[in-house]
């Protein structure tokens, strides 16, 4: 089966934005204009095509990124047919993991901003992630029809807040109620959309007198940006004073792909204006799989050995599993991005991370909530496979004889935990299955059993994250659950170095005894460095075969600190000395000796409790700014700054301990009459003040 669309005409793009910038509506319009959906779905009615979990439709926010395939020939049908794979990404800070995961498999991104709200905190997080994966991007300023819309203010904010380099390729005609259309700065024509045909029809017109000067100024800016792409274009521009449409496109494309500039467009998705021109810009400026560097990976047998794969059907097969979903009809769906080669249904592939073979049952391409079965997928494709038994997010699938591990994604540690139990005892097993399914879909969500209480503990990235998990258990698996009060994931560490601490485990009272003896030095490491074990035994005073048992013992002891039983982090343990008995020593004895030795050393090394600190940003009308700052300070928060917002109001940044943020949403609503919003994400662990840690220790001792 030959390829229908040449790979140069593929565009794998993500659409990402802050909540309520109108991202899902924008995606809906794309699907409408590209002919995938015949009736427009509105988030307002809970009928958007990409929001396919019931909860997303109820809450009007997108939680999981659905991958949708569609085709586009340009708004005036002037392009050959291009194939878009669009990944709709969530904009809520509790779901940053989803965004991170989508960024990994995208070639380009479309950042949607609200013309009134401008660059909001979540937009900064997404921008940082796009920088991390070097994703070329466009910016689309949506909601130009809303009161207070200001396109140029958003251009400014992208420069100042995100340190971006935006280059408008259109400018708006009018704003708010009289937003009519845009001026295309390449053609220097006005584009006016026809509302009756829901934006399917449009006309080119002369530029209205009132925007002529603005259009000329920004065209000059755009041509200069394009000219900087190469010496050749710069000379042409200096000689002729302008550039042709082809040259401008080529220059802007080269600089966008190099992540030097971001072409900017505007419109209103809800009123069907401007999205069509944005789709043309995706073709003009965003990369095809061939335009990005070859994907790199390592050899599973030799981590030092770097391998690369070209985006070519002739290459050996490699793909990345970037999302798992449980589907009501076919069971587990594994979304994959194919980087090289061809995958046909029935093929056997190799999961190079786990070292296991997998057989591909069926392959489906997603048209939002419709599925189309296909026989094969090729380099550059994004599709879902059915029938993979043991693949988790971020793992590589490759050719059986030519394995490769594409980079692993790094997932954040959860910061909030809750005990959860089924409402009826009979559902215990069902709940276990549901939670392990959900954990395999979402690596930032963890499940464990508390040894002491036997309770099931779920942990995640925020209150909303866990709320949605519990909600999904009820809807998708019919398990109703009660949840306990949220618990903060505290940690412990030590502050001073102690040397020569003995750990002994001796049971010798006739017959086969037990004997293990170790001597440790315990020292603190800098924050985030993690645990390190160093074997400094000389002359075999502790035999080689027992060293792994000693390390195992220390690792076990790390799970429960000496102050309040929280996990211990950022310490270095040196095994410096010890002794053994020919008959009575065993691995178990040395493991026990190591546990005792570590606990003893930790007690002497000035142990402290660490608490998670959150970066909190509150957007509030100016009248309430003082109240909000006072409240944050009373929560042991450090206010770090205050910025002005586009549509008036203040953005307050602070660092606040997570333990003080429970129930903040309700409190903030009542303080500001529901007019302020906030986002919060984990920043780092910091030492808890003495009175706080004493309270934590006392609470654990009860």
Swiss-Prot record:
NCBIfam families: EF-G, PRK12740.1-3, PRK12740.1-5, small_GTP
Species this protein is from: Acidovorax ebreus (strain TPSY) (Diaphorobacter sp. (strain TPSY))
Domain tr-type G residue range list: 8-290
Coarse class of the protein's main subcellular location: cytoplasm
Family to which the UniProt record says this protein belongs: Belongs to the TRAFAC class translation factor GTPase superfamily. Classic translation factor GTPase family. EF-G/EF-2 subfamily.
Pfam families from the UniProt entry: EFG_C, EFG_III, EFG_IV, GTP_EFTU, GTP_EFTU_D2
Places the protein is found: Cytoplasm
Keyword presence, Cell membrane: no
Keyword Magnesium recorded: no
Swiss-Prot/TrEMBL GO biological process terms: ribosome disassembly
Job of this protein: Catalyzes the GTP-dependent ribosomal translocation step during translation elongation. During this step, the ribosome changes from the pre-translocational (PRE) to the post-translocational (POST) state as the newly formed A-site-bound peptidyl-tRNA and P-site-bound deacylated tRNA move to the P and E sites, respectively. Catalyzes the coordinated movement of the two tRNA molecules, the mRNA and conformational changes in the ribosome.
GO MF entries: GTP binding; GTPase activity; guanosine tetraphosphate binding; translation elongation factor activity
CDD domains, A to Z: EF-G, EFG_III, EFG_mtEFG1_IV, EFG_mtEFG_C, EFG_mtEFG_II
Name by which UniProt lists this protein: Elongation factor G
Entries under InterPro entries matching the protein: EFG_II, EFG_III, EFG_III/V, EFG_IV, EFG_V, EFG_V-like, EFTu-like_2, G_TR_CS
Any one of the GO CC terms: cytoplasm
Binding site for GTP: 17-24, 88-92, 142-145
Domain of life: Bacteria
Keywords: Cytoplasm, Elongation factor, GTP-binding, Nucleotide-binding, Protein biosynthesis
